Each structure stands twice: as structure tokens, then as C-alpha cells.
């Protein structure tokens, strides 16, 4: 009997109750959690409505692919806010007494799986969007003829399934997700790293996240350079790149938001995976980095809400009036058909165009 009682005391929740040095103000945290969850859900709902309307409106194959991937990213952010936010509010409302409402560690495991999935999936989708746009700009004929909506849906499903697999890895390896030191969220084991497997999960998550950011940076750089080269090579075919310009601006904004919000958390997890977690300072740094990462799911939808063609046109007009400088003609924002885009692509990629440009 005494052995059974001692085993019951060493539950995942109880083990952390004796070492809770990283605390948060409960009332304030409940208030901010509710506000964050509400703002995130409303923002993502508005972005989903805008993207779905745009997907129905535009029948350009290149733009439809981008909008489909963007919709997947925003929907992932929406459910991440809904599920993770609801669990976080419940935890705060229960005074963070995990041992009282989650003795079997089921809720913590669900929380941890959702945290990993909703963190990794948008990063991977952002890199896939950057690759798709890079192919669409550098190889537009191949993109228009070979990459169909069916292929894009398969890529979207593949990314989601891969993120689910990574999130389920600890469960498949008979490892539990752990309550973190602040007792407000669950993730991989960061407190008492025992062996290589604990380090592996942390390093794998960090590596995949940083790799996704690196791929996005590289592909967006190639896309931007290609658009600039085409611009200087053939001034008369500007209108064929208007939809490219809008999507590239959105991609750059998504990449900047992801880098700023996710880099601290990914680097912190990598550091814990390599060096371990031995200080209160590491706990506070992790909590700050987590809050930064949470902002990513709030800011992502506003990229599609604010950086639409109509809004960009108005911003351009306002900037032109204030500065008195016309960098580009306003007709670059006018809608162009896929026929014009393919025409520009054919001209810019043909040997004749190269020859005429050189002369």
C-alpha cells in the first residue's frame, strides 16, 4: 500500500507542484488569455472569410494555389487559438492545479500535441507558400501547366499530416508531454532532461522550425530578385506581374512576422535541448518566448486583411501624396489575367528576349 501511495504522489502534475519557481499573476493572466483568444479567433475568422471570397473570385491558377495554402495557414492558426486558448483559460480558471483535474495527464498530452502542431504547421506552410511562389515566378509556365489545385491540396494535406506525426512522436515513443514550470502550458520535457530522446524532440522541433524559416527566406529572396530582373529587362510588361507583387508582399510580411515571433522560442528550445534547463532565468526566457510565438497567430491573419491589393493601392496613393514621389505607375496594381502573365513569362524566358535585352 505504501508503495502504491508513493507512486500516486509522483504524477506529472504533482512532480511540478514542488518546483514552481516560474509563476504568473493568475487574474491578469486569465484576462489576457481571454483577450488574446478572442482577438485571435476574430482576426483569423475575418482573414478566412477574405481568403475564401478571394479564392472564389479569382480563377487564376497561380493565385488560386497561393490562396489555398494561405487559407490552410489561417485555418490552422484559428484552431490553434481556439483549442490552446480554451485549455489555457480553463487551466487559469482552475488555479493551475493540474493534480486536481488532470491526474492521468490526458489533458496535458492533448495540450502539448496541439501546441506542437499549431506551432510547426504554420511555419511549414509558410515555407511551402514561399516555394510555390518561387516556382510561380521563376518557372511560371511549368507552374501553370503542371501544378494543379489537386497537387496543392495534396501538399497541404501532407504538411498537416507531417506536423501531426511530429506532434504524436512522444506519445508513440511512450513519453508524456510535461507541464512546464509556469504550470500554464504543456510541451516536450524541458525541466528534467534525462536522456537523448528528450533532447531529440526539442532539437527536432527547433530544427524543423528554423529550417522552414530559412527556406522561406531563401525562396522569397529568389522571388524578389527575379521580379526585379524582369522589371528592368522589360518595362512594357509590368501589368503581368501585379498579382505576383501582391502575393510576394504578403509572403515577405508573413516571413518577417514568423521570424520575429518564432525565432526566440525556437532558439530557446534548441538551447535547452543542447545545454539543459538549470535556472529561473531560462524559465522566464521560455515564457517570454512563448508569448512572442503566440503573437504570430494573431498577426498572421492581419497580413491578409491589411496587405490586400485594394489596401495597398490606397497606401500607395497616400504615400505618393505625402512624399510627392511616384516610384511606379499605378497601373501595376490593376488586375491582369493568366494569359498576360504567361505572355510575360514566355517573353522573359525566351532566348529572343535575352538577345533583344542585351542589344
UniProtKB/Swiss-Prot annotation:
Glycosylation site residues: 4, 19
Topology within the bilayer: Multi-pass membrane protein
Side Extracellular, residues: 1-31, 91-109, 176-198, 268-285
GO terms under biological process: adenylate cyclase-activating G protein-coupled receptor signaling pathway; cellular response to prostaglandin D stimulus; G protein-coupled receptor signaling pathway; inflammatory response; negative regulation of apoptotic process; parturition; positive regulation of cell population proliferation; positive regulation of cytosolic calcium ion concentration
Summary of the tissues where the protein is detected: Eye.
Cellular component terms per the entry's GO annotation: cytoplasm; extracellular region; plasma membrane
Major subcellular location class: membrane
Family named by the database record: Belongs to the G-protein coupled receptor 1 family.
Subunit organization: Isoform 1 can form heterodimers with isoform 5 (and probably other isoforms).
Protein name as annotated: Prostaglandin F2-alpha receptor
Organism field: Homo sapiens
Gene name of this polypeptide: PTGFR
Amino acid at each position: 500500500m505504501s508503495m502504491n501511495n508513493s507512486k500516486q504522489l509522483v504524477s506529472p502534475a504533482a512532480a511540478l507542484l514542488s518546483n514552481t519557481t516560474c509563476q504568473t499573476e493568475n487574474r491578469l493572466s486569465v484576462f489576457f488569455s481571454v483577450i488574446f483568444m478572442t482577438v485571435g479567433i476574430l482576426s483569423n475568422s475575418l482573414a478566412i472569410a477574405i481568403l475564401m471570397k478571394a479564392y472564389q473570385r479569382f480563377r487564376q491558377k497561380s493565385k488560386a494555389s497561393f490562396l489555398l495554402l494561405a487559407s490552410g495557414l489561417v485555418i490552422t492558426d484559428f484552431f490553434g487559438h481556439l483549442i490552446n486558448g480554451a485549455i489555457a483559460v480553463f487551466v487559469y480558471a482552475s488555479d493551475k492545479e493540474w493534480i486536481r483535474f488532470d491526474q492521468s495527464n490526458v489533458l496535458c498530452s492533448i495540450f502539448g500535441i496541439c501546441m506542437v502542431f499549431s506551432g510547426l504547421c504554420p511555419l511549414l506552410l509558410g515555407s511551402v507558400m514561399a516555394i510555390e511562389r518561387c516556382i510561380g515566378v521563376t518557372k511560371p509556365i511549368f507552374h501553370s501547366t503542371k501544378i494543379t489545385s489537386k497537387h496543392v491540396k495534396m501538399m497541404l494535406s501532407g504538411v498537416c499530416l507531417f506536423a501531426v506525426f511530429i506532434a504524436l512522436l512522444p506519445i508513440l515513443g511512450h513519453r508524456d508531454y510535461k507541464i512546464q514550470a509556469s504550470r500554464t502550458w504543456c510541451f516536450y520535457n524541458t525541466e528534467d532532461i534525462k536522456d537523448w530522446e528528450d533532447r531529440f524532440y526539442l532539437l527536432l522541433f527547433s530544427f524543423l522550425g528554423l529550417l522552414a524559416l530559412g527556406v522561406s527566406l531563401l525562396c522569397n529572396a529568389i522571388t524578389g530578385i527575379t521580379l526585379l530582373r524582369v522589371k528592368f529587362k522589360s518595362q512594357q510588361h509590368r501589368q503581368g506581374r501585379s498579382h505576383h507583387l501582391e502575393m510576394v508582399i504578403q509572403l515577405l510580411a508573413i516571413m518577417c512576422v514568423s521570424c520575429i515571433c518564432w525565432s526566440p522560442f525556437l532558439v530557446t528550445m534548441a538551447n535547452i535541448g543542447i545545454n539543459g534547463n538549470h535556472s529561473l532565468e531560462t524559465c522566464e526566457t521560455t515564457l517570454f518566448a512563448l508569448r512572442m510565438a503566440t503573437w504570430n497567430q494573431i498577426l498572421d491573419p492581419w497580413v491578409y486583411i491589411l496587405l490586400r491589393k485594394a489596401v495597398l493601392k490606397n497606401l500607395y496613393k497616400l504615400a505618393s501624396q505625402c512624399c510627392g514621389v511616384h516610384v511606379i505607375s499605378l497601373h501595376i496594381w490593376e488586375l491582369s489575367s493568366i494569359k498576360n502573365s504567361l505572355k510575360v513569362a514566355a517573353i522573359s524566358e525566351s532566348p529572343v528576349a535575352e538577345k533583344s535585352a542585351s542589344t
